[in-house]
Swiss-Prot record:
A Gene Ontology BP annotation from the UniProt entry: methylation
Name of this protein: Ribosomal protein L11 methyltransferase
Pfam families found in the cross-reference section: PrmA
Location of the protein in the cell: Cytoplasm
One GO cellular component term noted in the UniProt record for this chain: cytoplasm
Its job: Methylates ribosomal protein L11.
Family label: Belongs to the methyltransferase superfamily. PrmA family.
Gene name as annotated: prmA
Taxonomic lineage from the root: Bacteria, Bacillati, Bacillota, Bacilli, Lactobacillales
Species this chain originates from: Streptococcus pneumoniae (strain JJA)
Catalyzed chemical reaction(s): L-lysyl-[protein] + 3 S-adenosyl-L-methionine = N(6),N(6),N(6)-trimethyl-L-lysyl-[protein] + 3 S-adenosyl-L-homocysteine + 3 H(+)
Catalytic activity, EC: 2.1.1.-
Length: 316
């Protein structure tokens, strides 16, 4: 019987997606997130606060590796990669532990964390192996969270989806920068975008996004490619969305302003509280006007507009 190794990493909440992505890059065959907030239940209202539930500062990222992988090497590589990123984000003191699992335990363990989750008014994320019957008007995003990049329920992803729901009316061209799982591209298509171009620097993300897109019917309007932010891109867009680290976001703002059409939108997420002012100032210096600012915990998401009429935007 094949055995698997379970590697658990305890990290500050804001490091969830970063550590998950690093573990996948280091060969994990699946990633699960243990979070105290997962037990409050799924609701169909965005941004609901549950004061009776204590939000712990740390979450646990669990990665699964076949027994042919030397997890001590994975641990060392992870520590080295994290140390390179300490200037961008305080992840706290990493706690790492490993456990051996039988194959049937692996199959059950990582799947038990994932159930259908209503993310916004219209959008519900459903694991690929789950049979789910949509209600009237409900739009379903099928994801395989075992591939990489979590389930799409992280606050930065939730707020990005909410922002897309806010700005898309049908017929738009969308650029999805740092696509990861492809969830924002899939959502854009479901919300009526005519054409979506998804980019990621990571070859794993490009493959995973394509595989997730193929789980959802009618997604032929999504085009996935390797790319370094918006460098070399010449496609004009109605909406540009990016859910990546704040220190990386500021490097795409000028290209975003060049590519977004007049009256178009730039959605940025993945911004921790301490970096918000930096991102806002960079976007406004480029010529964008802030239309919507959302906050959930330590995370910020913003919708900027390229417009000459600022009467309807924040501060206008």
């Amino acid at each position: 019987m094949e055995t698997w190794q379970e590697l658990k990493v305890t990290v500050k909440r804001e490091g969830e997606e970063l550590v998950s992505n690093l573990l996948i890059e280091l060969g994990a065959q699946g990633v699960a997130i243990e979070d105290s907030l997962d037990y409050v239940g799924n609701v169909d209202r965005f941004g609901e606060i549950f004061p009776e539930v204590e939000q712990q500062e740390e979450i646990v990222v669990t990665a699964y590796y076949p027994d042919t992988v030397d997890v001590t090497v994975v641990e060392a590589d992870l520590q080295a990669r994290i140390s390179e990123l300490t200037d961008f984000m305080d992840l706290g003191e990493l706690k790492i532990g490993t456990t051996a699992l039988a194959e049937e335990d692996w199959a059950d363990n990582w799947k038990k964390y994932y159930e259908p989750a209503r993310i916004t008014h219209d959008l519900t994320i459903v694991p690929s192996w789950t049979d789910y019957e949509a209600t009237a008007g409900e739009k379903i995003i099928k994801l395989d969270p075992g591939m990489a990049f979590g389930t799409g329920t992280h606050p930065t992803t939730k707020m990005s989806l909410f922002a897309l729901e806010q700005v898309l009316r049908g017929g738009e061209t969308v650029l999805d920068v740092g696509t990861g799982s492809g969830v924002l591209s899939i959502a854009s298509s479901l919300l009526g975008a005519k054409e979506i171009f998804a980019y990621d620097l990571d070859d794993v993300a490009v493959r995973v996004a394509q595989e997730n897109i193929e789980l959802n019917p009618g997604m032929e309007n999504i085009h996935v490619a390797a790319g370094d932010l918006l460098k070399g891109v010449e496609i004009e867009a109605d909406v540009i969305v990016a859910n990546i680290l704040a220190d990386i976001l500021i490097h795409l703002i000028d290209d975003a302003y060049r590519l977004v059409k007049d009256e178009g939108y730039l959605i940025m997420s993945g911004i921790i509280k301490d970096k918000w002012d930096m991102v806002r100032e960079s976007a406004e210096s480029a010529g964008f006007f802030l239309e919507t600012h959302m906050v959930q915990g330590e995370w910020n998401t913003c919708v900027f507009k390229k417009t000459k009429d600022i009467s309807g935007v924040i501060g206008g």
